[in-house]
Amino acid sequence: MRLVSAGLAALFFFLAAASSAGAACTGATVLFQDNFDNLQPTWGEPNEAMKLDNGQLVVMPAADQYFWQPNTANLYDDVDLCVNMTTVTGVDPEEAKAGLVFWYVDVNNFYAFELAPNGKASVWRRQRGRWLTQVAWQEAKGANRGDGAINELRVTTVGSQAAFYVNGTEFKELTGSPPENGQQVGIFAVSPAKGAATFSFDNFKVTKP
């Protein structure tokens, strides 16, 4: 877990959208799967920014804080990675954001696919401890917005190519720099300066594309 300065209610149609997209990771070989019935130790210990609640991994960074947590179960080569993410309390729909971490090497070197409660998404690279924009913030077609919204996020990596999806609709593709010796994957969240945002994650799944 890393922190850096910087009621779970959902409408029925949000739930339906998430359920219909539940099989997004289409690889035949499941490499890792977590429905968060229990907090697996490969997520680390619960703390003030991350806990298990009602079968969800709940992440709540303090105001103006970044949080990311890789899962240490495996090192992967190519992956098809997906998760259901709920915006519980966004506080600021432009400045709050959450998503998936991939091509993770260490605290200073990884990529993040992020979605904000306003329906915009972006991709960032953290290299040598600095944030580098890979895909600038822009509208993500098919994204559900606001508090209570559930969105299925998906990342596929094949070699140096990565593709990003929101609720089954492709957002962008890019050519990046994957680690030479395998990647970890995980989750990511940011709270705005106005206050602590809360996001929850469920149905985290990694398959072989």
Language-model region placement:
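Short, aromatic/His-centered strand-loop micro-motif at the edge of beta-sheets
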Residues: G129-E152
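Flexible glycan-contacting loops in extracellular carbohydrate-active proteins
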Residues: L174-D202
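Extracellular beta-strand elements of beta-rich domains used
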Residues: F36, D202-V206
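Short carbohydrate-recognition loop motifs
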Residues: E48-F67
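Short tryptophan-centered beta-strand motifs in secreted/extracellular beta-sheet-rich domains
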Residues: F36, L81-V83, G146-V158, A162-F164
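Bacterial N-terminal signal peptides
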Residues: A6-A17
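Secretory/extracellular carbohydrate-interaction modules
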Residues: P61-Q127
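Extracellular carbohydrate-recognition regions
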Residues: A23-E45
